[in-house]
Protein backbone atom coordinates (compact mmCIF):
# COMPACT_ATOMS: atom_id res chain seq x y z
CA UNK A 1 0.00 0.00 0.00
CA UNK A 2 3.00 2.31 -0.14
CA UNK A 3 1.64 3.86 -3.37
CA UNK A 4 -1.40 5.35 -1.68
CA UNK A 5 -1.13 8.81 -0.16
CA UNK A 6 -3.37 10.99 1.93
CA UNK A 7 -5.84 12.59 -0.45
CA UNK A 8 -6.06 9.62 -2.83
CA UNK A 9 -9.60 8.63 -3.70
CA UNK A 10 -9.75 4.84 -3.67
CA UNK A 11 -12.28 2.27 -4.83
CA UNK A 12 -12.42 -1.28 -3.52
CA UNK A 13 -11.86 -3.36 -6.65
CA UNK A 14 -11.65 -6.82 -5.16
CA UNK A 15 -11.00 -8.79 -2.00
CA UNK A 16 -8.13 -11.12 -1.23
CA UNK A 17 -9.43 -13.33 1.56
CA UNK A 18 -11.04 -10.59 3.65
CA UNK A 19 -8.56 -7.84 2.81
CA UNK A 20 -9.75 -5.20 0.32
CA UNK A 21 -7.73 -4.49 -2.82
CA UNK A 22 -7.92 -0.91 -4.03
CA UNK A 23 -7.64 1.00 -7.30
CA UNK A 24 -6.82 4.70 -7.32
CA UNK A 25 -9.79 6.64 -8.69
CA UNK A 26 -8.08 10.01 -8.46
CA UNK A 27 -6.57 12.51 -6.11
CA UNK A 28 -8.62 14.94 -4.11
CA UNK A 29 -8.23 18.65 -4.86
CA UNK A 30 -5.33 18.25 -7.29
CA UNK A 31 -5.44 20.56 -10.27
CA UNK A 32 -3.39 22.03 -13.08
CA UNK A 33 -3.46 25.71 -13.98
CA UNK A 34 -1.52 27.95 -16.34
CA UNK A 35 -3.64 31.07 -16.80
CA UNK A 36 -7.13 31.34 -15.30
CA UNK A 37 -7.88 27.74 -16.24
CA UNK A 38 -8.34 25.05 -13.62
CA UNK A 39 -8.19 21.39 -14.61
CA UNK A 40 -8.90 18.95 -11.81
CA UNK A 41 -7.50 15.42 -11.59
CA UNK A 42 -10.86 13.76 -12.26
CA UNK A 43 -11.38 15.84 -15.41
CA UNK A 44 -7.92 15.00 -16.72
CA UNK A 45 -8.42 11.33 -15.87
CA UNK A 46 -11.67 11.24 -17.88
CA UNK A 47 -9.98 13.01 -20.81
CA UNK A 48 -7.13 10.49 -20.84
CA UNK A 49 -9.64 7.61 -20.63
CA UNK A 50 -11.58 9.03 -23.61
CA UNK A 51 -8.37 9.36 -25.60
CA UNK A 52 -7.33 5.82 -24.71
CA UNK A 53 -10.69 4.42 -25.79
CA UNK A 54 -10.78 6.35 -29.07
CA UNK A 55 -7.18 5.96 -30.20
CA UNK A 56 -5.15 3.43 -28.20
CA UNK A 57 -7.53 0.51 -27.74
CA UNK A 58 -7.88 -0.05 -31.52
CA UNK A 59 -4.08 -0.62 -31.50
CA UNK A 60 -4.25 -2.96 -28.48
CA UNK A 61 -2.53 -0.36 -26.32
CA UNK A 62 -3.59 1.10 -23.01
CA UNK A 63 -2.38 3.67 -20.50
CA UNK A 64 -0.65 1.95 -17.59
CA UNK A 65 0.23 5.08 -15.64
CA UNK A 66 0.62 8.80 -16.16
CA UNK A 67 1.73 11.95 -14.42
CA UNK A 68 1.32 15.54 -15.50
CA UNK A 69 2.51 19.03 -14.78
CA UNK A 70 2.27 22.52 -16.22
CA UNK A 71 5.35 23.64 -18.11
CA UNK A 72 5.50 27.41 -17.64
CA UNK A 73 9.11 27.69 -18.82
CA UNK A 74 7.78 27.90 -22.38
CA UNK A 75 5.70 30.77 -23.72
CA UNK A 76 2.87 30.09 -23.75
CA UNK A 77 2.88 27.50 -20.98
CA UNK A 78 1.32 24.12 -21.65
CA UNK A 79 0.29 20.86 -20.01
CA UNK A 80 2.78 17.97 -20.19
CA UNK A 81 1.66 14.38 -19.61
CA UNK A 82 4.23 11.64 -19.00
CA UNK A 83 2.56 8.44 -20.09
CA UNK A 84 3.53 4.77 -19.89
CA UNK A 85 1.69 2.54 -22.33
CA UNK A 86 1.21 -1.21 -22.27
CA UNK A 87 4.22 -2.92 -23.83
CA UNK A 88 3.84 -2.81 -27.60
CA UNK A 89 6.30 -2.12 -30.38
CA UNK A 90 5.41 1.52 -31.00
CA UNK A 91 8.75 3.33 -30.93
CA UNK A 92 9.52 3.05 -34.65
CA UNK A 93 6.00 3.14 -36.03
CA UNK A 94 5.28 6.54 -37.60
CA UNK A 95 1.55 5.83 -37.87
CA UNK A 96 1.47 5.13 -34.12
CA UNK A 97 3.19 8.48 -33.62
CA UNK A 98 0.23 10.13 -35.37
CA UNK A 99 -2.10 8.16 -33.07
CA UNK A 100 -0.41 9.70 -30.03
CA UNK A 101 -0.65 13.16 -31.65
CA UNK A 102 -4.40 12.57 -31.99
CA UNK A 103 -4.52 11.48 -28.34
CA UNK A 104 -3.18 14.95 -27.45
CA UNK A 105 -5.98 16.64 -29.39
CA UNK A 106 -8.68 14.35 -27.95
CA UNK A 107 -7.49 15.10 -24.42
CA UNK A 108 -7.65 18.84 -25.15
CA UNK A 109 -11.13 18.48 -26.68
CA UNK A 110 -12.25 16.71 -23.48
CA UNK A 111 -11.06 19.44 -21.12
CA UNK A 112 -13.22 22.31 -19.88
CA UNK A 113 -14.31 25.27 -21.98
CA UNK A 114 -12.00 27.72 -20.19
CA UNK A 115 -8.95 25.62 -21.15
CA UNK A 116 -10.15 25.25 -24.74
CA UNK A 117 -10.87 28.98 -25.11
CA UNK A 118 -7.49 29.99 -23.68
CA UNK A 119 -5.78 27.49 -25.98
CA UNK A 120 -7.70 28.06 -29.21
CA UNK A 121 -8.76 31.71 -29.08
CA UNK A 122 -6.50 33.63 -26.69
CA UNK A 123 -3.41 31.44 -27.28
CA UNK A 124 -2.31 31.80 -23.64
CA UNK A 125 -2.02 28.02 -23.31
CA UNK A 126 0.16 26.10 -25.75
CA UNK A 127 -0.56 22.69 -27.30
CA UNK A 128 -0.75 19.75 -24.94
CA UNK A 129 2.36 17.56 -24.92
CA UNK A 130 2.54 13.81 -24.29
CA UNK A 131 5.91 12.29 -23.45
CA UNK A 132 5.92 8.51 -23.72
CA UNK A 133 8.25 6.90 -21.19
CA UNK A 134 9.92 3.51 -21.36
CA UNK A 135 8.27 0.46 -19.84
CA UNK A 136 8.63 0.34 -16.06
CA UNK A 137 9.45 4.04 -15.61
CA UNK A 138 6.75 4.59 -12.99
CA UNK A 139 7.86 1.50 -11.05
CA UNK A 140 11.36 3.00 -11.00
CA UNK A 141 9.92 6.19 -9.52
CA UNK A 142 8.16 4.25 -6.77
CA UNK A 143 11.22 2.06 -6.10
CA UNK A 144 13.32 5.22 -5.81
CA UNK A 145 10.79 6.77 -3.43
CA UNK A 146 10.60 3.74 -1.14
CA UNK A 147 14.38 3.29 -1.12
CA UNK A 148 14.79 6.87 0.08
CA UNK A 149 11.65 7.01 2.24
CA UNK A 150 10.67 10.18 0.42
CA UNK A 151 7.75 11.48 -1.56
CA UNK A 152 7.99 10.78 -5.28
CA UNK A 153 7.01 14.41 -5.95
CA UNK A 154 10.56 15.55 -5.21
CA UNK A 155 12.20 13.68 -8.07
CA UNK A 156 9.47 12.29 -10.35
CA UNK A 157 10.08 14.74 -13.22
CA UNK A 158 13.82 14.12 -13.22
CA UNK A 159 13.38 10.34 -13.36
CA UNK A 160 10.60 10.40 -15.97
CA UNK A 161 12.38 12.94 -18.18
CA UNK A 162 15.43 10.65 -18.30
CA UNK A 163 13.19 7.81 -19.53
CA UNK A 164 11.30 9.63 -22.31
CA UNK A 165 11.27 7.62 -25.57
CA UNK A 166 9.17 10.01 -27.69
CA UNK A 167 7.48 13.40 -27.50
CA UNK A 168 4.19 14.36 -29.15
CA UNK A 169 2.20 17.59 -29.41
CA UNK A 170 -1.41 18.26 -30.24
CA UNK A 171 -1.63 18.73 -34.03
CA UNK A 172 -4.41 21.31 -33.83
CA UNK A 173 -6.42 23.44 -31.47
CA UNK A 174 -9.52 22.26 -29.65
CA UNK A 175 -12.88 23.68 -30.61
CA UNK A 176 -14.37 26.07 -28.11
Regions found by a protein language model. Give the residues of each.
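AMP-binding adenylation
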Residues: 1-176
Amino acid sequence: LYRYKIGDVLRVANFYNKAPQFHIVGRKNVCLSIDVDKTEETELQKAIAASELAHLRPHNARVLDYSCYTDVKTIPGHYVIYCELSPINHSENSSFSRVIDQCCLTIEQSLNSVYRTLNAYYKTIGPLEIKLVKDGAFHEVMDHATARSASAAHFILEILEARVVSTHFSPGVPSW
